[in-house]
């Protein structure tokens, strides 16, 4: 009789523990989905980001816009502005290094909240994302070994070169436009390495990156850039329909008025490219 009572108590204890575990798991799942549910009910990406407490920023290694310092922290003009904007809406910025060719998938899957990485406002980007107003001017430039630069001073002269370009980038678009052969790599930094190693004749990269990373006093002292293939502008991309784009436009305007945006640009020597708001 006593053994039966003990057995019943053991069974009851197991059931209670199991029920408690299920309840706790359900609670955790509820916490992680609260931000999503509120965003769905309000239709606000801004509220979604505020509720979860983080703005997840998709980036690549792209000096002077986004790159890691000696401590492994993301810095650069875009990175610093992202941190400041996140603070202004009461959250923290987190940085995730992405495959540039998959940036739209990362956004739509909510593994990131924005693409803030010197992104050129081409038609494809503007049709698939909610983009801010342009905040910086740029161009795609041709990078070649410095001792060969004199040979490549116009588009016609570079058409027969083999290029390295970042997959899905504006540089890739421009190389396709002129009809040159190219190899797509994972980042603009990798494109520079391809030229430095002799695997490619040239690279098409952002002018701002070229100014920061090649030439005398850099790790690519033997490289230089010659011609511009286009003129373009940078913007930040959010999920289609996101109200964060308008919030960031407002922040850009205020930070231009109070001088903080220009001060940040001066830190990374890109102030001449800023678009006045």
Q: What annotation goes with each model-predicted range?
A:
Residues 25-38:
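Bacterial lipoprotein signal-peptidase II cleavage site
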Residues 29-31, 79-88, 169, 233-272:
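Extended ligand-binding regions for polar small-molecule ligands
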Residues 36-118:
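Extracytoplasmic small-molecule ligand-binding "clamshell" domains
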Residues 55-56, 90-92, 109-117, 161, ...:
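Alpha-to-beta junction loops
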Residues 58-63, 96-101, 110, 114-122, ...:
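Beta->alpha turn/N-cap motifs
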Residues 95-106, 150, 167-170, 183-197, ...:
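Short helix-initiation/N-cap motifs at beta->coil->alpha
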Residues 137-144, 207, 211-253, 272-277:
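Periplasmic-binding protein-like
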Residues 144-162:
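Flexible hinge/capping segments at coil-to-helix
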